Amino acid sequence: NSKFLISAQVSGEGTIHDNQLFIRLIRNTASGFPGSDNIAICTGDNGSNNSAPENTSAYHGYATSNSDSTISTTHITNHVDSPSVAAGGNLQYKVQIYLQSSMTWYLNRCVTLYDATYGDYLPSFVTVMEIAQ
């Protein structure tokens, strides 16, 4: 069974100001990768005594005074995972976004599509590297 080094970056902007946005690193090893088999990994511990979500990273949305042109970026830096999957088995990693409030989220861009120096466009990615044993 292999180990994997995972890193990610998520960039974008939501339509509601002053909100917290959370991301979760997800692993799925089931055949066909059904959503019901998603497992959050590399998350904080809520103590299992409350309903607070356990997340991997967090960041704040834009400020009220700059409501449509400030992209945010957060990172998951170098998490080592041991999924107990045999070589050639089913393995999927992905990043989930969790929004504090109901809003539209624009991935890799700001809310308004500006053709000017203040319109932001940044990438999002997940990198997975197998660690030689």
Predicted region positions:
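Terminal beta-strand-rich extracellular "head" domains
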Residues: 3, 7-90, 94-133
